[in-house]
Amino acid sequence: MPVAITRQVSPAIGDCELTHLERTPIDVDVARAQHAAYEAALAALGCRVERLPAEPDLPDSVFVEDAAVVLDDVAILTRPGAESRRDERPTIERALAPYRDVVAIEAPGIVDGG
């Protein structure tokens, strides 16, 4: 059974990084409902959803696909250009370690997933 790793929405998601979009307020309750629907869709497709807890101090951490590039045999932990994203790495590494060998991009390298 495929595994889908997700993370609950941070209460600080309204402070997330945006690079080119005009900011409109994010309704945390709506974001949580949308994320629950996303997880339900993954489960309906046959995935076992492994949900990580929210990271209250990491607004962007719900976007787990940015923290690693996962291939068949290895997971590559990214080193995002935004310093605010780099503290997401330890929990993603722990979540991926049971499923893949894990390697990491180190300074001065920069890789953004997604």
Show where each model-derived region lies.
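The feature marks the mature, well-folded catalytic cores of soluble enzymes
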Residues: 1-114
